[in-house]
UniProtKB/Swiss-Prot annotation:
Residues the record lists as binding Fe cation: C90, H132, H136
UniProtKB keywords: Hydrolase, Iron, Metal-binding, Protein biosynthesis
Name this polypeptide is given: Peptide deformylase
Catalytic reaction equation(s): N-terminal N-formyl-L-methionyl-[peptide] + H2O = N-terminal L-methionyl-[peptide] + formate
HAMAP family according to UniProt: Pep_deformylase
Pfam families per UniProt: Pep_deformylase (PF01327)
The organism of origin for this protein: Natranaerobius thermophilus (strain ATCC BAA-1301 / DSM 18059 / JW/NM-WN-LF)
Protein role: Removes the formyl group from the N-terminal Met of newly synthesized proteins. Requires at least a dipeptide for an efficient rate of reaction. N-terminal L-methionine is a prerequisite for activity but the enzyme has broad specificity at other positions.
Names of required cofactors: Fe(2+)
C-alpha cells in the first residue's frame, strides 16, 4: 500500500509508551499493511508502529521462516532463564549495531488481525525479534539495552 518514513534516532515517538489498540478496524488493517510494506522495503525483519510515528501497540515480524506475524497489543508473558548475547540492529538506528543480552525463549500473547488471541512460543531469532519490537512499544530501543554500540563496519 504505502511505504512510510521510518523515525530515527532521538525522535520522541521512539521514547514514548505506545497506546493499547482498542478497535480493530480497516484503519488498523491499513496500518499493518503499510508496516509490512515499509519493513520489506527497508529490508528489516521487524517493525513497531512507533517506528513510523504511530503510537499504537502493533508490531510486524518476518524472520524469513513460515509465518509472518502481525501482532496487536503483544505482551511477553514468560521468558527463559537462559540468556544469550547477540548483535542487533534497528531500522531506526541505521548503521549502528549493538550487543544485547536477551532471554533465549519467550512466550508472547497477542491478538491477530482477526481479533483471535495468539500464544507464540518463540526461541532464537524469532524470540529476539519479538522482544526487540515489543521493547519499542514501551519506549525502549536496543541502544538502551546494548552493552556496547558501534557502527556496522566496526563489528568485524
Amino acid at each position: 500500500m504505502a511505504i512510510k518514513k521510518i523515525r530515527t534516532n532521538d525522535d520522541p515517538v521512539l521514547k514514548r509508551k505506545a497506546k493499547k489498540v482498542t478497535n480493530i478496524d480497516d484503519r488498523l488493517e491499513r496500518l499493518l499493511t503499510n508496516m509490512l510494506d515499509t519493513m520489506y522495503e527497508a529490508e528489516g525483519i521487524g517493525l513497531a508502529a512507533p517506528q513510523i510515528g504511530i503510537s499504537k501497540r502493533v508490531i510486524v515480524v518476518d524472520i524469513g521462516e513460515d509465518e509472518i506475524y502481525q501482532l496487536i497489543n503483544p505482551e511477553i508473558v514468560d521468558t527463559s532463564d537462559e540468556q544469550e548475547k547477540a548483535l542487533e540492529g534497528c531500522l531506526s538506528y541505521p548503521g549502528l549495531q549493538g550487543r544485547v543480552t536477551r532471554p533465549v525463549k519467550v512466550t508472547v500473547k497477542a491478538l491477530n488481525p482477526q481479533e483471535e488471541e495468539m500464544i507464540i512460543e518463540a526461541e532464537g531469532l524469532l524470540a529476539r525479534a519479538l522482544q526487540h519490537e515489543i521493547d519499542h512499544l514501551d519506549g525502549i530501543t536496543f541502544i538502551d539495552r546494548a552493552e556496547e554500540v558501534f557502527r556496522e563496519e566496526e563489528s568485524h
